[in-house]
């Protein structure tokens, strides 16, 4: 539905992404036909995903030669930036269009150790396993906090490491407080987004 364009995301990586100039216009037209249509938050490279990339470049031991699962991946920038360092990687989102685009980029980059799946963090099948789980700015809706904490805790209890990137917004503290006992490491990043500087915290969660 959303027009895509090939963009240089890093010195080494070009990805197909939704055309930023077209997304709002297309969404506006679609919403006139369906007033309940949710905004495609997946269709943007968010500051949190850029901070996640920086963190994983600085600390690759969290993903090197490991099975990695990115949940709520959207475009999947962190996954694509580390795919060649992992054993296997799953890029997942609940939005089918996001997953279709991820599959296009997997083929574009000729990644044999990578697959994209439609997954809901509330109901991840038990056969989906990972050493490390990536979450970038998934905690934006307070009504989802309890369900997200339950899913995160479930993964921590089976021995997964979780790398979580989140903007410093007013709702962040109540969410992070629910996970306070699992915080192993925190790093802060300043990410330029247009004319703004966004403060992003990256947490490593372990049991």
Sequence positions of predicted segments:
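S-adenosylmethionine-dependent methyltransferases
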Residues: 1-207
């Amino acid at each position: 539905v959303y027009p895509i364009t090939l963009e240089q995301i890093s010195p080494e990586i070009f990805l197909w992404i939704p055309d930023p100039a077209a997304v709002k216009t297309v969404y506006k037209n679609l919403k006139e036909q369906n007033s309940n249509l949710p905004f495609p938050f997946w269709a943007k490279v968010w500051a949190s995903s850029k901070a996640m990339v920086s963190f994983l470049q600085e600390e690759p031991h969290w993903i090197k030669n490991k099975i990695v699962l990115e949940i709520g991946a959207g475009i999947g920038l962190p996954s694509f930036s580390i795919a060649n360092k992992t054993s296997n990687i799953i890029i997942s989102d609940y939005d089918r269009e996001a997953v279709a685009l991820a599959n296009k980029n997997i083929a574009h980059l000729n990644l044999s150790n990578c697959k994209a799946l439609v997954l809901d963090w509330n109901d991840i099948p038990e056969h989906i396993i990972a050493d490390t789980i990536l979450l970038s700015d998934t905690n934006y809706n307070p009504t989802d906090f309890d369900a997200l904490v339950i899913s995160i805790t479930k993964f921590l209890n089976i021995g997964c490491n979780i790398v979580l990137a989140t903007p410093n917004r007013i709702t962040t503290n109540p969410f992070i407080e629910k996970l306070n006992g699992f915080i192993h490491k925190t790093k802060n990043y300043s990410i330029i987004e247009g004319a703004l500087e966004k403060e992003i915290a990256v947490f490593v969660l372990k049991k």
